[in-house]
A protein has these predicted regions:
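Accessible peptide chain termini
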Residues: 1, 212-214
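N-terminal leader/targeting and accessory segments in enzymes
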Residues: 1-108, 112
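Phosphate-binding loop of NTP-binding sites
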Residues: 74-77, 86-212
């Protein structure tokens, strides 16, 4: 096991971790976190475990606690770590802010990858053209003979790839404004395509949106 994966295990083992939603990337991470010794709570607006369809069997098998329905954010209380998704727009709302004030670590799959990734990271953000730019940069590195790990807002979840990442590789990551809200680690190279007034229904104003991208 690489030392970066060991550091991740040290962060997770024995901790109470709440996941907001069970999207594709979170399903992979939930299993990994349980295997690393975390006590996982899944917070979701669904009303019962049966509403998760085929994933209900995995929830039972892994022994995941559930905080469901209208008050699903109550599951934040008493957690050591909260794993948010890019689609969760309640970052500045009271439940999450109260959790952070109580000392809970709020992070995401891509943020943890930034924290523990041993190779250089090229990050691409902006309002338009992110996916095209990210894809082209990845192709350039591949043509130069580098092993590329492509992810973020494009491709697969990056954190489960961590054991396969070596210092000689390069990670090319697409980031949305929602993913940037709580980012505290910087990439080695940052690319901003442009910033236009998108998603102002989820950001306070254009100034906040612009500052997030810087």
């Amino acid at each position: 096991m690489q030392k970066d994966q060991q550091k991740l295990e040290q962060l997770i083992k024995g901790k109470k971790v709440a996941f907001i939603g069970a999207g594709v990337s979170h399903k992979t991470l939930i299993k990994e976190f349980v295997e690393l010794g975390a006590h996982v709570t899944l917070c979701d607006q669904k009303k019962s475990v049966e509403d998760f369809g085929d994933y209900a069997a995995t929830i039972r098998e892994l022994g995941i606690d559930l905080s469901l329905g209208e008050n699903y954010l109550d599951g934040f209380k008493g957690q050591d770590i909260i794993m948010r998704t890019p689609g969760f727009v309640g970052y500045f709302e009271k439940p999450l802010q109260d959790a952070m004030a109580a000392g809970t670590m709020v992070t995401s799959e891509v943020e943890l990858f930034f924290d523990f990734c041993p190779c250089p990271i090229v990050a691409v953000t902006g309002s338009d053209g992110k996916t095209t730019t990210t894809t082209l940069i990845a192709k350039f590195f591949e043509a130069a003979g580098r092993k590329v790990h492509l992810g973020g807002n494009i491709g697969a979840a990056l954190l489960p790839m961590l054991p396969e990442v070596s210092p000689d590789d390069v990670a090319v990551v697409e980031l949305s404004s929602f993913q940037l809200i709580s980012m505290h680690s910087s990439p080695n190279v940052a690319v901003v395509t442009n910033v236009t007034p998108n998603h102002l229904d989820h950001h306070k104003d254009m100034q906040e949106l612009s500052l997030i991208h810087i």
